Amino acid sequence: MNYPGTELELFAEATNWKRYFASKLRPFVRGRVLDVGCGMGVNANYLVGPTVSSYTFLEPDLQLLAHVPDHIDASLKKMSEMVHGTVDKLEGRQFDTILYVDVVEHIEQGPDELDRAYSLLAPGGHLLVLVPAYQFLYSKFDEEVGHVKRYNKEQMRSELPRWARPVSLYYLDSMGVLLSLANKFLLHQARPTRSQIRFWDRCMIPISRIMDKVL
């Protein structure tokens, strides 16, 4: 499987954004971690803390998986493994944390995927899902990078495994909504430029960190 577009390469430089969402997820990341659809592994360094004992990178695109060692710290390499495939390949194993960072929106049958992942979750474990918000923002960019849809809270809750008990469900990057609206109705770009990514990451994410607390 080959990943469409250059989304991963563009957003690899969005370090403020990665620090922001990682700060929300990291308190739940512990023990044996499975990173589903890890891409090039660029999120792992932001998510790993002292409570992580092992880290499994799972990616269906072999070319992307080959780049993982280039993007992770030496300490993480010592406790990590790379697996080419999908969650079906890990049947019978258990993990304390399962991550889906910008992955579920690419999958036609999201609920089935999360059900399979949940079967790999150890008792007391956490399933962490990050997806793009609001279907009304769906644009040429989403289509270009293979997004099936965007989510609101109710849709996300409905696709979680029926046995799961949601601990937290919220929106991030309120200022990003304005930029997405501008692209959808004015720019009509299939992908942002590097300078646009930098503007969003350096100028808008710090504002979102403040605004997200009050909205």
Segment roles from a protein language model:
Residues E7, V42-N43, S168-S208:
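Conserved catalytic loop of SAM-dependent methyltransferase domains
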Residues L8, L127-E159:
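Short, glycine-/aromatic-enriched active-site segment of Class I SAM-dependent methyltransferases
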Residues V101-V104, L130:
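Residues lining the SAM
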Residues P111-H126:
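A short glycine-rich, Lys/Arg-flanked "PGG" loop and its adjoining helix->strand segment in the class I
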Residues R157-L172:
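A SAM-dependent methyltransferase catalytic signature shared across enzymes that methylate proteins
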